[in-house]
Curated annotation (Swiss-Prot):
Organism listed in the record: Rattus norvegicus (Rat)
Name under which the protein is recorded: Voltage-gated purine nucleotide uniporter SLC17A9
GO molecular function annotation: ADP transmembrane transporter activity; ATP transmembrane transporter activity; guanine nucleotide transmembrane transporter activity; purine nucleotide uniporter activity
Catalytically driven reaction(s): ATP(in) = ATP(out); ADP(in) = ADP(out); GTP(in) = GTP(out)
InterPro entries: MFS (IPR011701), MFS_dom (IPR020846), MFS_Na/Anion_cotransporter (IPR050382), MFS_trans_sf (IPR036259), SLC17A9-like (IPR044777), Sugar_transporter_CS (IPR005829)
Length: 447
């Protein structure tokens, strides 16, 4: 008995005893793995926006073919967000449980297929508006899981000191994708018709899915994930995160409010800027206003991540850096949006639009990373909650934008709406935003 007791009293060997932080370290990507995945996720985000922006680029041509007015075009444009807002939390939860990379791959394969088949749906009988709206809702449902799953993946696999640059690099794919569809898509639109733009973006997405599946993912892990989804079973033990405690924190609501404002203002500009330039400057080249703002936004996004990590490494408080990024991403960008509604010069409009879109990319190094600061153990879920709020606001914002244009005939009201929404979110984050973790479960040692 003494020998048994003494053996039971022996400390657990250090190599077999792992703290949560040590277990998290085991899941981190190595430098080569991080570089490879960053490149592939950058491309994935690019294709996400290629398919998302296809409809705004083609709206004018499709409206002419099918006889849609501004309100009907607004319904089609906003229908994406009807689906998008429903799967944010699900995407984050699944990313936390089965792995964000698997969620991303499965959803991309489905939205790529739907994008390719959208022109076919549009010509099914006389209900073209209903069929196109339905396809956009499905696309929104499938793309809604992407960023929550991405946030979950990066919070688990990337070192904290590198998250801002990694996230801003991957986030730059949104501008690259918009740029690709705006440039190549505009050429295809003029030469081959609007259907070719859908075939182009959807086909590239399916090729990306094949490459990631073939070379980066373990087939057994993907099959296991599919089995888990089919059975509806959790992969890991139930979460012990104190949700009631989490949502009592003002900092959590501040980041949700700021994400809502950021997403809403971005979606309004994303959806309506092509139509604004097409109608205000009808003799301008489509590829110019569909390319230049997003082209300049790419280095802006990379710079925001670089300067954010640099400031933190030099000793500036994390929350100070996050708030500075939001002043640029919501405050300064809204000023240029206001200017956009008070000029009749094409050149000035291009400058203001480029500046507004460019400064919005600073949000990648602000609130997007602040969610990982607050709750790295459930970052996907929390981002899903925040982006659900943003998507719902996007539905209202895009529809309201179409209504304002139709009833007032003025684009100034739309840009005023962007400025109001942006500054409400900025003010909330500046007052209540923090960077301390709020997902830690109190232990006896803490009492």
């Amino acid at each position: 008995m003494p020998s048994q007791r003494s053996s039971l009293m022996q400390p657990i060997p250090e190599e077999t005893r792992k703290t949560p932080s040590a277990a998290a370290e085991d899941k981190r990507w190595s430098r080569p793995e991080c570089q490879l995945w960053t490149g592939m996720l950058l491309l994935g985000t690019c294709l996400l926006y290629c398919t998302r922006v296809t409809m705004p680029v083609c709206t004018v041509a499709m409206s002419q073919d099918f006889g849609w007015n501004k309100k009907e075009a607004g319904i089609v444009l906003s229908s994406f967000f009807w689906g998008y807002c429903l799967t944010q939390v699900v995407g984050g939860h699944l990313g936390d449980r089965i792995g964000g990379e698997k969620v991303i791959l499965l959803s991309a394969s489905a939205w790529g297929f739907i994008t390719v088949t959208t022109p076919l749906l549009a010509h099914l009988g006389s209900g073209h508006l209903a069929f196109v709206t339905f396809s956009r809702i499905l696309t929104g449902l499938l793309q809604g899981v992407y960023f929550p799953a991405l946030t979950s993946l990066l919070s688990q696999r990337v070192q904290e000191s590198e998250r801002s640059f990694t996230y801003s690099t991957v986030g730059a794919g949104s501008q690259v994708g918009t740029l690709v569809t705006g440039g190549i898509g505009s050429v295809l639109l003029d030469r081959c018709g609007w259907q070719s733009v859908f075939y182009f973006s959807g086909g590239l997405t399916l090729l990306w899915v094949y490459y990631v599946y073939k070379y980066l993912l373990d087939e057994k892990d993907l099959v296991l994930a599919l089995g888990v989804l089919a059975q509806g079973l959790p992969v890991t033990r139930p979460s012990k995160v104190p949700w009631r405690q989490l949502f009592r924190k003002a900092s959590v609501w501040a980041v949700i409010c700021s994400q809502l404002s950021s997403a809403c203002s971005f979606f309004i500009l994303l959806s309506w800027l092509p139509t604004f330039f097409k109608e205000t400057f009808p003799h301008s080249k489509g590829w110019v206003f569909n390319v230049v703002p997003w082209l300049l936004a790419i280095p802006a996004s990379l710079f925001s991540g670089f300067i954010s990590d640099r400031l933190i490494s030099q000793g500036y408080r994390v929350i100070t850096v996050r708030k500075f990024m939001q002043v640029m991403g919501l405050g300064l960008s809204s000023i240029f949006a206001l200017c956009l509604g008070h000029t009749t010069s094409f050149l000035k409009s291009m400058i203001f639009a480029s500046a507004s879109i460019g400064f919005q990319t600073f949000n990648h190094s602000g609130i997007s990373v602040n969610i990982q600061d607050l709750a790295p153990s459930c970052a996907g879920f929390l981002f899903g909650v925040a982006n659900t709020a943003g998507a719902l606001a996007g539905v209202v914002g895009v529809c309201l934008g179409g209504y304002l244009i139709e009833t007032t005939g003025s684009w100034t009201c739309v840009f005023h709406l962007v400025a109001i929404v942006s500054n409400l979110g900025l003010g909330t984050f500046l007052v209540f935003g923090k960077a301390q973790r709020v997902d830690l479960v109190p232990t006896h040692e803490d009492l």
